[in-house]
Each structure stands twice: as structure tokens, then as C-alpha cells.
């Protein structure tokens, strides 16, 4: 049986990172997302600069203001977070259909079928993080292991912008020395019960019998017994069927030079073709999306008589669509190429004259 390979990706201080990306003046500042300092709400996310003051998620905004009076308090912009999350999830699904989102900024990926001797899971995780950085200008931390529990644990070990692998060689040492509060799923209430019963780290948990843990925690006790041993048989659950494949890029500065933009369209067409080839699919629709310097999103789609899968075919159509969309007086900050209506590949090469 092939050993499973699971990646857990967790974006670093996601909401705050998006705010700092979209407003560069906030970069490096103690950013606190959730609302005004005087509001009755709670903190959604705090940047690492704000966390140095003791600010953390779910803290009342009033308390955050007392701890960090010079912080930059920002109202949540869920539209921007959802849009960025959709980009990130699209990146995940360009690698595998086995994706289980846990929230806007977190997901499990089962990449077992992608791993080869020359392409270990850690390398795939590096590629995914690189794609996220290039396409969204945000950093992510990744954990790689042979089950979901250990992958999630690993993703939190070297934040921010970290990559950690837990394998059979190091799992025991990591779990035995792990503070009990750092076990995924152990909250404040559980931690207190643990401490009251002499459980302060993984070794203490490991030394408890399954019966003792069930007595203390009910059905959860069996799961805790297994976690202390690095055991987790749960599957990555994905009910989504892939309907499209695409790639986007945000330019470092706003651009209105056709030559530069079309070079990027060629690059995106190539990446999209690679992913179609990996899936052994071809597409009957091509879409080009642009986002202007004013953050207005425009898109244009073409439906095709015959499906396409090559870099050249996708570029030829994307070229036509871009020319329909462009306004030479309006710089753009993002461009994307997406193909949809997927079917099994026929590998028929076409020319631009088939589409006009």
C-alpha cells in the first residue's frame, strides 16, 4: 500500500496580510483586523507586529486597544478575503482534486498520487507556496506528513512562511516534547482538565491508557490516545469536481504596456496547458480576466467548437480576448487565464483561424 502524503496549508495571519498587501502603508505595522478600536467587536486577525503586544484573535477590540494603543485598527473586508481565498483554492486544485478546505485560509491536500522518487511531497509543498506567493503576494506555511493530524501540527511549527515535514523518523520526538496546549483540538477547557490530571506534554498523554482518557474525555479520549501515537486514519474529504483550470498573476506595479502584458498571458497559457496535460483534459471555454488599477474586475469568455489543451491554442484565444478587453488608457494590476468545460483530451492542435 502506498504511504499517504498529506499537505496542510495555513496562510499566515491571512486577513492582516491581505490588508497589508492592498495598503502597503500598513506593511510592518501592528495591524489589527476586526473593526474600530472603540467597537464592541473582537479581533479577527492580528499581524505578528501586533501579536508582540499580546493581541490575538477573538480578543475584544477594546482590550486590543489597551494592549496596543498605537495599532492600526482595520475593519474586516470579507469581499477581498473571499476573492483571495478563491485564488488560493484554485492553486490547490491545480495540483490535485483531493482538497478539503477548512476555512478561507486553510486546507488539506492529499498529494499521494503526485509523489515520485524525484518529486517528494516537500518539493510539491514548496511549489504550492511559491505559486501562492507569486499569484497573491502572500506567504503561507505548510506541513507535510503521512496523515492529516500530523500535517496540521507541522504547518504551525515554523510560522510564518515555514515548511515542516513530520515523518516516521522524527514523529515520536516531536510528539513527546510537545506542550499539551499545542496539540490540535486541545482548547482551554481541555487543557485545564489535562493539567488537573498531570498531563502537560505529549509524553504525559502517551503514558495514559486509552481507558483513562475515555474516562476523562468521553469519546474524544480514543482520539487523544491515537494522537499521542501519531495515528490518524481520517481521509481528505473533497466533494468538488474540477470544472476549470486557471492561473492569475498580480503585477508588482500597475501596467498598461501590451508587450509586457502579453508576455504574461503567454506564461499563464503555458502553465494552464501544463495543468490540463497533467489532468489529461482539454477545454471548450477560455476566459481572460483583468483587474484594473482601480480594482475593477473585467472578464471575457469564448466558447469553442473544438476543445483545446496546448499552450499555443490557449494563448491564441486569450490574445483575442485580451484585445477585446483592453483599454490603452487604463493600467491593470492583475491578469488571469482560465479554461473550463473540461473533457478528456483529444490533443488536436488548432490555429487562430479556427476561432475567428
UniProtKB/Swiss-Prot annotation:
What is the enzyme's class at the highest EC level? Answer: transferase
- Sites marked Substrate discrimination: 15
UmuC domain span:
6-187
Name the gene for this chain. dinB
Q: What is the predominant subcellular site recorded for this chain?
A: cytoplasm
Cofactor binding remark:
Binds 2 magnesium ions per subunit.
Q: What is its EC number?
A: 2.7.7.7
Q: What is this protein called?
A: DNA polymerase IV
Needed cofactors, names only, are: Mg(2+)
Q: Where in the cell is it found?
A: Cytoplasm
Question: Residues that bind Mg(2+), according to the entry?
Answer: 10, 105
* GO CC annotations, alphabetized: cytosol
Q: Which family does it belong to?
A: Belongs to the DNA polymerase type-Y family.
Which Gene Ontology terms cover its molecular function? damaged DNA binding; DNA-directed DNA polymerase activity; magnesium ion binding
Function, in words: Poorly processive, error-prone DNA polymerase involved in untargeted mutagenesis. Copies undamaged DNA at stalled replication forks, which arise in vivo from mismatched or misaligned primer ends. These misaligned primers can be extended by PolIV. Exhibits no 3'-5' exonuclease (proofreading) activity. May be involved in translesional synthesis, in conjunction with the beta clamp from PolIII.
Amino acid at each position: 500500500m502506498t504511504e499517504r502524503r498529506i499537505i496542510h496549508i495555513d496562510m499566515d495571519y491571512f486577513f492582516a496580510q491581505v490588508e497589508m498587501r492592498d495598503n502597503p502603508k500598513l506593511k510592518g505595522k501592528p495591524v489589527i483586523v476586526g473593526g474600530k478600536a472603540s467597537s464592541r467587536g473582537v479581533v479577527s486577525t492580528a499581524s505578528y507586529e501586533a501579536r508582540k503586544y499580546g493581541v490575538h484573535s477573538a480578543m475584544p477590540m477594546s482590550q486590543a486597544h489597551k494592549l496596543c494603543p498605537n495599532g492600526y485598527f482595520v475593519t474586516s473586508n470579507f469581499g477581498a478575503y473571499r476573492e483571495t481565498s478563491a485564488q488560493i483554492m484554485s492553486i490547490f486544485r491545480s495540483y490535485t482534486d483531493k482538497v478539503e478546505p477548512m476555512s478561507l485560509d486553510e486546507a488539506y491536500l492529499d498529494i499521494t498520487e503526485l509523489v515520485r522518487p524525484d518529486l517528494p511531497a516537500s518539493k510539491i509543498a514548496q511549489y504550492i507556496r511559491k505559486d501562492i506567493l507569486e499569484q497573491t503576494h502572500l506567504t503561507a506555511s505548510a506541513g507535510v506528513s503521512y496523515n492529516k493530524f500530523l500535517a496540521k501540527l507541522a504547518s504551525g511549527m515554523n510560522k510564518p512562511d515555514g515548511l515542516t515535514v513530520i515523518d516516521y523518523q522524527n514523529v515520536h520526538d516531536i510528539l513527546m516534547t510537545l506542550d499539551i496546549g499545542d496539540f490540535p483540538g486541545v482548547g482551554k477547557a481541555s487543557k485545564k482538565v489535562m493539567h488537573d490530571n498531570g498531563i502537560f506534554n505529549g509524553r504525559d498523554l502517551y503514558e495514559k491508557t486509552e481507558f483513562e482518557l475515555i474516562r476523562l474525555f468521553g469519546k474524544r479520549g480514543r482520539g487523544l490516545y491515537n494522537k499521542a501515537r501519531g495515528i490518524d486514519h481520517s481521509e481528505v474529504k473533497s466533494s468538488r469536481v474540477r470544472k476549470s483550470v486557471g492561473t492569475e498573476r498580480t503585477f508588482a506595479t500597475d501596467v498598461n504596456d501590451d508587450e509586457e502584458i502579453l508576455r504574461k498571458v503567454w506564461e499563464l497559457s503555458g502553465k494552464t496547458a501544463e495543468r490540463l496535460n497533467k489532468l489529461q483534459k482539454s477545454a471548450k471555454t477560455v476566459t481572460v480576466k483583468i483587474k484594473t488599477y482601480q480594482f475593477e474586475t473585467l472578464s471575457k469568455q469564448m466558447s469553442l467548437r473544438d476543445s483545446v489543451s496546448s499552450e499555443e491554442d490557449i494563448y491564441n484565444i486569450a490574445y483575442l480576448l485580451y484585445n477585446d478587453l483592453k483599454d490603452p488608457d487604463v493600467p491593470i494590476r492583475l491578469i488571469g487565464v482560465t479554461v473550463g468545460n473540461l473533457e478528456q483530451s483529444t490533443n488536436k492542435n488548432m490555429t487562430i483561424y479556427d476561432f475567428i
